[in-house]
């Protein structure tokens, strides 16, 4: 891991943590690392992975609580925050995120071969962490999924229409980048997204996803993140991956989250052999927005009760 403070980025680095870089073979992941006095040989670190179009600041409130017990590293996934973008011609497939996480752990957290680490993922990050835990159970001590319980699925008959849609979008490309007068204007737009945020939460999350351009600001996030993926998992594949998770797992279910009324959720939950479910108040960003204490209490109790 390479510790740095990026020029001009100090406004979005919370007290008690530092900017970090983790070089991979084809790009460099950035993120935030929270200081702890706990020896990694006593308590393995916690890796935190955010949701789609978010960044490491998603864990600004939760990470300091966990750092009282272990080293905490929140990554910006590829194409998000301060991390590198995929090369031209490439997209952002789900399994590529899992490959990034695998490479990150292998190269920068080799101690996990002896002391399995903890994974905490929100939304897409929870999906990525769950797939990694299914593939490499020996490297994961405990898994936490916040408002996340397996990948979005499509029926097999939707394979070709999905492929067509993805290839057409790849050929047509992205729309020109919107330019905002200030970060606050972009944050206002983000408040009304698919998963709405309060002004406070949007103000915490958005600056790390922005960069200056001329007299204004544009999204730093890769526009290709909004392109449809060419291939999605079937429900049978999702269920098989969840059934392969051997590590103790916590599902944090938000009362007003995206999964609150999701059909088929009980079936997925039943497939994970060692699953604990906790219900918390709040929306999809229950770990960042509003009263986050119930989420922090549940996760601390789950991760550090041994």
Residue ranges and their predicted role:
Residues 1-46, 67-70, 109-113, 300-306:
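Alpha/beta-hydrolase fold catalytic core
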Residues 13-14, 25-27, 32-38, 73-120, ...:
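Active-site loop/oxyanion-hole signature of alpha/beta-hydrolase fold enzymes
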Residues 35-84:
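Conserved HGGG/HGGXW glycine-rich cap/lid loop of the alpha/beta-hydrolase fold
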Residues 121, 125, 129:
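Gly/Ala-rich beta-loop-alpha elbow adjacent to hydrolase catalytic centers
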Residues 134, 142-178:
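Flexible "cap/lid" loop of the alpha/beta hydrolase fold
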Residues 175-232:
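Conserved alpha/beta-hydrolase catalytic His-Asp/Glu region
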Residues 246-283:
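Conserved loop-alpha-helix segment in the C-terminal half of the alpha/beta-hydrolase fold
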Residues 283-292:
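Catalytic histidine-centered segment of alpha/beta-hydrolase-like enzymes
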């Amino acid at each position: 891991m390479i510790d740095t403070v990026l020029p001009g980025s100090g406004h979005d680095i919370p007290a008690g943590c530092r900017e970090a870089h983790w070089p991979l073979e084809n790009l460099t992941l950035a993120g935030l690392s929270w200081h702890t006095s706990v020896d990694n040989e006593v308590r393995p670190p916690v890796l935190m992975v955010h949701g789609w179009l978010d960044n490491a600041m998603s864990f600004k409130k939760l990470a300091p609580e966990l750092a009282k017990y272990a080293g905490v590293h929140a990554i910006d996934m590829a194409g998000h925050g301060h991390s590198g973008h995929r090369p031209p011609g490439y997209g952002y497939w789900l399994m590529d995120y899992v490959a990034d996480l695998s490479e990150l752990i292998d190269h920068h957290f080799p101690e996990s071969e002896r002391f399995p680490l903890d994974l905490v993922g929100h939304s897409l990050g929870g999906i990525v962490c769950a797939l990694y835990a299914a593939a490499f159970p020996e490297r994961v001590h405990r898994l936490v999924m916040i408002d996340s319980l397996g990948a979005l699925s499509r029926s097999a008959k939707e394979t070709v229409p999905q492929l067509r849609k993805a290839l057409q979008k790849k050929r047509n490309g992205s729309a020109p980048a919107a330019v905002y007068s200030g970060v606050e204007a972009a944050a206002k737009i983000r408040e009304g997204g698919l998963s709405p945020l309060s002004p406070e939460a949007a103000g915490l999350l958005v600056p790390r996803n922005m960069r200056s351009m001329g007299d204004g600001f544009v999204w730093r996030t890769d526009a290709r993140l909004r392109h449809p993926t060419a291939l999605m998992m079937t429900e049978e594949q999702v269920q098989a991956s969840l059934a392969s998770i051997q590590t103790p797992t916590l599902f944090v279910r938000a009362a007003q989250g995206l999964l609150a009324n999701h059909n088929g959720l009980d079936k997925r939950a039943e497939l994970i052999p060692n699953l604990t479910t906790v219900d918390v108040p709040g929306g999809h960003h229950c770990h960042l927005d509003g009263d986050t204490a119930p989420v922090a209490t549940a996760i601390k109790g789950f991760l550090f009760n041994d």
